[in-house]
A protein has these predicted regions:
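Domain-scale recognition of functional cores that engage charged ligands
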Residues: 2-15, 26-171
Length: 171
């Protein structure tokens, strides 16, 4: 079935934002959780790319995928996306929204954590609530608005059941 022109216009004004800052450590992976294999050799990230490519296909527009990475997930995610370079998913300037980082605070006394032998352990990502400050502070919000984006579909990178629902866009 073909996609109605009004729906194509709505899809064209949407960005798909995936929260991709978490590591899969509880599942034995020291990389982004989105790089876990979930079916055969396919990862969450492979299926996310397929979902966005499908939206591009049915709308005939370059629907944007934006991954909110953390300092812990950026490098492996971008390296993995190299296999999708021909589809426009490998350029960090086009697909990456970097989450901020905040100092780890010790529960006892609320002072900053100190780890001189591994200073990177003194920092942590602030979590999903950082989406709005990261969009604003990175300049992505202005870029998206300038590109005519009006709607943002946001979900965790490991939630493949969450997909863009045209009923919400039509409302």
């Amino acid at each position: 079935a073909s996609t109605p022109a009004a729906d194509k216009d709505l899809i064209a004004r949407c960005v798909c934002i995936k929260l991709n800052g978490g590591l899969g450590t509880s599942m034995g992976l020291q990389k982004a959780k989105s790089l876990l294999k979930i079916k055969g050799e396919d990862t969450f990230l492979d299926l996310i790319v397929r979902q966005v490519k499908h939206l591009r296909s049915i709308s005939g527009t370059p629907v944007r995928l934006l991954l909110m990475n953390s300092f812990s997930t950026s490098a492996d995610t971008l390296a993995y996306l190299e296999k999708y370079a021909a589809d426009g998913f490998a350029d960090p300037a086009q697909v990456e929204l970097m989450q901020n980082r905040v100092p780890k605070i010790l529960a006892d006394g609320l002072s900053p954590a100190s780890c001189p032998e591994q200073p990177e352990l003194e920092w942590c990502p602030p979590g999903h609530g950082d989406l709005y400050p990261a969009l604003l502070g990175s300049g992505w919000l202005d870029r998206l608005l300038a590109d005519g984006v009006k709607y943002a579909f946001v979900s965790n990178s490991d939630n493949l059941g969450a997909q863009l629902d045209m009923n919400f866009l039509r409302w």
